[in-house]
Regions:
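Short Pro-Gly-centered beta-turn/loop motif in secreted/extracellular proteins
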Residues: 266-281, 566-573
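Acidic-and-aromatic substrate-binding clefts and catalytic sites of carbohydrate-active enzymes
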Residues: 260-271, 292-307, 334, 379-389, ...
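Extracellular and organelle-lumenal recognition/adhesion modules and their flexible linkers in secreted
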Residues: 22-256, 272-276, 303, 326, ...
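Aromatic-rich peripheral "rim/lid" segments of glycoside hydrolase catalytic domains that contact
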Residues: 193-207, 333-336, 342-343, 350, ...
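Bacterial N-terminal signal peptides
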Residues: 6-16
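Aromatic-lined carbohydrate-recognition surfaces of secreted/lumenal glycan-active proteins
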Residues: 255-258, 371-374, 396-428, 447, ...
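Substrate-binding cleft and catalytic face of glycoside hydrolase catalytic domains
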Residues: 111, 115, 284-298, 307-417
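Conserved, mostly hydrophobic/aromatic
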Residues: 104, 150, 229, 285, ...
Length: 605
């Protein structure tokens, strides 16, 4: 039951300070999407006794366009940040493609967060289910007023009243003030580059941040080893002065993307280019939708089919890809075939139906998939557990293991690393407790999936802290669904580089998989590495720079007097070519921990 708690107590007058990243003027002609004096129109929704709201006066100051602010005190932190939420409906229409500006001012009157800042997530969303957000911005501020300018292009159209401004405030106990709220629509007559923007930053983004040196040490320790090439002559004696060329061919660490299996399996110029990019960029893939239960049963219509999915999986296997399957059970009614709802009053029959599905799909794809997400997003999706009891989760793992004795069987969830820098959310705690329960009950959990759909940056050292928390289970961890918004492409590239570096430096992580790479097939198109026309974005350049340059080993040299050539390289597969006079030999090598030796002999037996 939600109760609106309003307190109109007048508090002391406030002083003013702000920091601006840009001083661009606001373009003329913008239409307001919100009512005049919207602060007075905002309504608070919150669980009983968890928050209170009031209007407070603000001491006038030059350049400050407001004389009052909305003050919200979060008393008890709810499970989800939007459970303490300010809402104001739109009063004008927005059309897909319109250039808009969200502007607001924020300060912390009081906070218990260790950063000394208060937090708010401000968004403009559909006013009904599915609450799609056109813009979603995480902000934080200390005790001085800070202005935020957030330009965006509307991705959907909504008539007046069918969208709403929202401010989520369900964080650690804090008192936050927000003022000067404006939401302007410039239509298509203004370039987004001409609209002011607050440059986002995050702790550790500095080029000389201390964590970077630590990351390099960890990467050298955990992702590299010594490769020794020993060259012998026909008599088996060490051959000095031989030329050695070491060429890396494939990372041991998994770098990958979600892919559309029916596109991988289908002919056509666009699909040819799609496959080409996959083969060039990745050594690991996961299906985006094709293997989800309704798609697997062709309930989402063409072009999904078991035949195309299996054909694509066979091609990927031929090309040497490590393949993730996603997902056997997404335990909410909206994510399973509709007929299962008929069994909501029959737990035994529901258990049987899910068990049979797991066995059928894993049997059909056996030998083609290396690891499965057995269960996806249990924090937000638990209808099946509500009917059957939470012990049914253990049954799902055991059903998968009965068919797949060697595959890694993952649990997967979101908002663990991508929690706005928070390390104490109900979602994180639930995930930890779920993993512990599964292991205690004997479920053969083989890995921990961390989706990583970001809206705002989590500082790299906070990423390490969270990874350490889940590393205690001694299971491989994988980044399974990374994406980061691209409204600021420079920030997108910078954070992609830093996040990848942080996870590559952590010994418990064995893979980094993004949730799509091409704008033409991406659930969040601005997150893609390649634009619709095929051109690469800065985040794509950052990915390639790391994976194929900074973390890639190609080396040339000569054998020493003992016939050996040594190089420290990144773990993975190599091609080694040795030449001496007119003799030449090429052999494959695999560089593992703690190191590998390849012996190349010319002539003889």
């Amino acid at each position: 039951m939600t109760k609106l708690l309003v307190s109109l107590a007048v508090t002391c007058l406030l002083t003013y300070a702000t920091s601006r990243a840009e001083d661009k003027p606001v373009p003329a002609g913008g239409q307001s999407l919100l009512a005049e004096n919207v602060e007075a129109q905002l309504k608070l929704g919150a669980p009983k006794d968890s928050a209170e709201m009031g209007l407070v006066p603000v001491k006038p100051h030059a350049g400050q366009p407001f004389s009052q602010a909305v003050r919200v005190r979060t008393i008890v932190r709810p499970q989800r940040d939007y459970e303490v939420q300010l809402i104001a409906p739109s009063v004008a229409a927005v059309t897909q493609g319109d250039v808009c500006l969200l502007r607001f001012w924020l300060r912390a009157a009081d906070t218990t967060h260790e950063s000394g800042e208060a937090r708010a997530r401000v968004y403009f969303q559909k006013a009904s289910s599915d609450w799609h957000k056109i813009v979603d911005y995480a902000a934080s501020a200390a005790d001085q007023w800070k202005r935020f300018d957030v330009p965006f292009v509307a991705g959907r159209s909504y008539p007046a009243g069918q969208a709403a401004l929202g401010v989520a405030l369900g964080y650690k106990p804090q008192t936050v003030e927000i003022a000067g709220i404006r939401l302007l629509n410039f239509g298509r007559g203004v370039r987004i580059a001409d609209v002011p923007r607050t440059k986002q930053t995050y702790a550790g983004s500095e080029p000389d941040a201390a964590w970077r040196a630590e990351a390099e040490k960890r990467i050298d320790q955990h992702r590299k080893a010594d490769l020794t090439v020993r060259v012998l002559d026909a008599e088996g004696k060490p051959l000095a002065g031989a030329d050695v060329a070491v060429r890396m061919k494939r990372h041991a660490f998994g770098f990958g993307s979600a892919v559309v299996l029916y596109m991988v399996a289908s002919p056509g110029e666009e699909n040819d280019l799609y496959r080409k990019r996959i083969f060039e960029l990745f050594n690991r893939v996961v299906n985006e939708n094709d293997l989800k239960w309704p798609a697997w049963e062709s309930q989402w219509g063409r072009p999904y089919s078991k035949e195309k999915s299996i054909a694509a999986l066979k091609l990927l296997r031929e090309k040497g890809f490590y393949v993730r399957g996603h997902c056997l059970v997404w335990p909410a009614w909206r994510h399973v075939p509709g007929e299962l709802q008929k069994l909501k009053n029959d737990p035994a029959a529901l258990r049987k139906a899910v068990r049979e599905h797991i066995v059928e799909e894993t049997t059909a794809t056996k030998g083609l998939i290396d690891e499965w997400d057995v269960m996806n997003e249990p924090f937000s999706n638990h209808d099946l557990m509500d009917v059957c009891g939470k012990d049914v989760m253990v049954e799902w793992w055991k059903a998968a293991r009965s068919v797949l004795p060697e595959a890694r069987l993952y649990v997967n969830d979101y908002a663990i690393l991508a929690a706005g820098g928070d390390t104490a959310t109900a979602h994180q705690q639930h995930y930890e407790e779920t993993i512990r329960y599964l292991l205690d009950q004997g479920a053969p959990v083989g890995g921990i999936g961390l989706q990583s759909h970001f809206r705002s940056p989590t500082p790299p050292e906070t990423v390490w802290k969270l990874l350490d928390r889940f590393a205690k289970f001694n299971l491989p961890m994988s980044i399974t669904e990374f994406d980061f918004p691209g409204d600021d492409e420079e920030l997108q590239a910078r954070y992609t580089r830093d996040f990848m570096t942080a996870v590559f430096a952590h010994p418990g992580v064995d893979g980094f998989v993004m949730w799509g790479f091409w704008e033409g097939r991406h659930w969040r198109p601005d997150c893609a590495m390649f634009r619709r026309d095929g051109s690469i974005k800065p985040n794509g350049e950052a990915y390639k720079e790391l994976v194929f340059k900074r973390w890639w080993t190609d080396a040339d040299g000569q054998t020493a007097a003992d016939g050996a050539y040594k190089v420290r390289g990144f773990l993975g597969d190599y091609e080694v070519t040795v030449s001496s006079d007119s003799l030449r030999k090429t052999e494959a090598a695999k560089l593992d921990k703690p190191g590998s030796t390849l012996t190349v002999k010319f002539g003889g037996t």
